Amino acid sequence: MASGRAGSAARNAESHKCFSLLFYRAVRDLKPVWMLEDMRTMEAFYLEDDAGQRIFSPSEALLYAIVHDHQAYAQYLLTRYGEAALAEPGERFCCCPSSAPHLTMAVRYDRRYILGLILQESRRVPGYARADGRFRTPLHLACELLRPEAVIMLLGSGACASAQDHDGFTPLDVVLEKLRDSSVLDGEEARRCLDHLIMFMPKVHFKLKEVLGKTPEVWSKVLGEETYKYLAGQSPAPLAVSTMQTILQQLSPDTFPASLSELPIPSCLKPLGLPVSPRDQQRV
């Protein structure tokens, strides 16, 4: 009897593994949305007795869509299922620990269009992606990976620039470490991340502030004299920075980034890399 149950469980596990691979490949190959939804919900594809394991949830399907940049499927899942698409995935999905796994995955894979869709939908989900100090936030990750476009999208959508991880590091701390250790190749991206963070931080709080004061000769070279003095608390924000900080405080996250793009100010004052590229728009 026991051996029979064990054999049945093994067959169920194997069948689920096979279907998972089929579904994974279908999303990877950018199959039509209707086909993917038929696969995801059709019970004929499943042999398990456990109804809870019969289908991939919208949340799990969205993770596949993010990984393979299936923009149309991601848009469908978020539009059709809303909050359910942003729910925690099941235990069978091994994601990086995060309070917002879908945002984190979109940042990690640099899926800017899907990131924008998730941010738009997440505004309707109370408490979504709220920093709790246990994990690094998606903004921490965007800074770690030097993704300035993701940084500005997250900040404009209400991400907290001063959120701390379990070590007390803010996204600004992450960028400063990157700048200190950066090569010529990634220094420009790190600098853009820093500039974005500063514009959304009228009050600068970060763990490395004391370190900046101890080695001014190093940090003034890395940051430039004006930025160094501002971050070290030795001078107020430069006029252009102060102006943008004031302007950005007036913008609603609900209308970002369109509200920023439409501001009647010189383009040189606007952040680079505002989403979404024309190529991405055409792909959906």
What is the predicted role of each segment?
Residues 1-77:
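N-terminal segments that cap or nucleate solenoid repeat domains
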Residues 2-18, 26-28, 167, 174-284:
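Cullin-RING E3 adaptor/co-adaptor recruitment helices
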Residues 14-26, 50-63, 87-104, 128-138, ...:
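Ankyrin-repeat boundary/"N-cap" motif
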Residues 40-49, 76-89, 116-126, 152-160, ...:
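Ankyrin repeat domain, specifically the short helix-to-loop turn at the C-terminus of the second helix
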Residues 122-146, 258-268:
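Eukaryotic modular interaction domains in large regulatory/scaffold proteins
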